Amino acid sequence: MKQFIDFINKSYTAFHAIKNLEEMLEKANFKKLTEDCSWELEPGCSYYVIRNTSSIIAFKIPKSTTNVGFNIVASHSDSPSFKVKPNGVVIDTANDFCKLNTEGYGGMITYSWFDRPLGVAGRVYTQSENSVKEHLVNFDETLVIPSVAIHLNRSGEFNPNMQIDMLPLFGNSSTSFDSILKKYVGNEEVISHDLFLYNKEEARLVGASNEYILSSRLDDLECSYTSIKALIESDAKAISLCAVFNNEEVGSRSNNGADST
């Protein structure tokens, strides 16, 4: 259980989750494949392939491949969240606020995002001479989406607008998002980013006998972790395959989603 909780706590985004799953597979002697090369697979060996640093397929081939079938399990690496837009901030000069410019991602329970310590993590692309670099980042800064005081919401209704009521506070109006971003990628030119909010509260066991897990991102990291763990520990009698796709929360129709090739 501790290993699972540790996995959840350091899997801030789909990109971090795939990196952590890859480390598990590497420790179990799975061999990495790439899609731009032909594969020479051997009976009794284990392999994995990653696409777009956010999806992974791992499989085991039994020693005997005569009349074998497939055992397949699938899950997804992404979780409901808020995604940072390309124009990263909204400056409210009148109230001296800098808000992170976000949009909803996936099927979230909106009220669970209020009044919690929120982090920003994901990947950032920079231009370096003649190449593009990908950086996996996790901001030290903590944000918050504040709720409204009760005397300002007498109606009792709760129907927040994500683009108005749920932009997280990032600092005062002089806060520079670009300057903070450069803390994590250096002075190289930032050309793009895939950044998401996540709940900084760590997973923990709760209940009289610690029989329950309290955590964000259980949808669907619980299945991602347990399916990869099961594959690693299995004694393959068939071709056993585990697929962890991205973008399930938004329809799976991406080049690294379940509706891809």
Task: Show which residues each predicted segment covers.
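N-terminal hydrophobic/helix-forming segments and targeting peptides
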Residues: M1-T261
